[in-house]
Amino acid sequence: MRGLRQGIMKQLPILEPGDKPRKATWYTLTCPGDRPCPRVGHSCSYFPPVGDAESGKIFIVGGANPNQSFSDVHTMDLGTHQWDTATREGLLPRYEHASFLPSCSPHSIWVFGGADQSGNRNCLQVMSPEDRTWSTPEVTGSPPSPRTFHTSSAAIGNQLYVFGGGERGAQPVEDVKLHVFDANTLTWSQPETHGSPPSPRHGHVMVAAGTKLFIHGGLAGDKFFDDLHCIDIGDMSWQKLGPTGAVPVGCAAHAAVAVGHHVYMFGGMTATGALNMMYKYHTEKQHWTVLQFDTSLPAGRLDHSMCVIPWPVMSTSENKDSDSVILTLQDEKGDAAEKAETQSGGPHEESPTTVLLCFVFGGMNTEGEVYDDCLVTVVD
């Protein structure tokens, strides 16, 4: 089956700063500096520019390899295209955790749960944007039990949503409650929901698009799920969806991001190996598409992490009255969307335009090879 190959792959083209990426193409980014070592279970988040900065940064938090779990934070500056170490202070080592940036403090990164070699966690930690140190704030309400819960896309506004997760080995927690953490009030709650929630699972993707949370796949014991569920936080009603199109196979340890009305899903594992396919789901039409690429595909992988980043390119305006479209990343409501502005330029004036890329870092195959590569492809 196409997409199940995980061995030696052809080298992908390199996307250089300022280059305009082509659609239906996977690229690698090769940035110098203090890059993260190969790892799995890390989180990957895009931070918008702070203060006078023109470009944002990608933050890679935690993760693990077969020998240890990490408490480091690495950043990729999208202006200088260099890696750096942000901090090693205060973060408890963890992997397969959740991360989010609340709208009340969009330059603070929160992490929840995950595990290290000694067991699962259920604590929350936050990194201050001023001094880049981590703290463990006191919270109220009943937190979820300790669990792995690997996502960077399950937040809407100030609230992180937690469903399911890993207990031990291939077994999920039996809890099917929806847990909500509010970063503004520092409170956990378990709102009453309606309908039938998904069965217990871990390794599923949970991604917010607008006011809806979508859950796909996951694992319980040796059973891989291929179902798709949705809950709208407006009425708190669970729905099991029956989408059309190229429905993905049952898988776990994959990753997903939302861009407008689309959810992009990449990678994961099945009983036969690691996947390197990308799917697009239209949340309004409830339709799946498997994306076709003009170039080689990345190596199949699982337990990687993804986020959506803006990528500036330079275009030359031949007409002073011509308009260039500028896309900006909007994640105020927990999803990435596109906002168009127009900008007029003089004859032959270079003006910046921005495209949105899905950024993928790390992961591993089912043969034990752990990756430290950076992959990108255009999403729209």
Swiss-Prot record:
Subcellular location: Cytoplasm; Endosome membrane
InterPro entries in UniProt: Kelch-typ_b-propeller, Rab9_kelch_effector
Chain positions of Kelch repeats: 57-103, 108-154, 159-211, 212-258, 262-311, 357-380
Mod. after translation: Phosphorylated on Ser residues by PIKFYVE.
Keyword Phosphoprotein appears in the UniProt entry: yes
Keywords, in A-Z order: Cytoplasm, Endosome, Kelch repeat, Membrane, Phosphoprotein, Repeat
GO cellular component: endosome membrane
Keyword RNA-binding belongs to the record: no
Cited function: Rab9 effector required for endosome to trans-Golgi network (TGN) transport.
Assembly notes: Interacts with PIKFYVE; the interaction recruits RABEPK to the endosomal membrane. Interacts with RAB9 in its GTP-bound conformation.
Protein name as annotated: Rab9 effector protein with kelch motifs
Species whose genome carries this gene: Mus musculus
Origin organism lineage: Eukaryota, Metazoa, Chordata, Craniata, Vertebrata
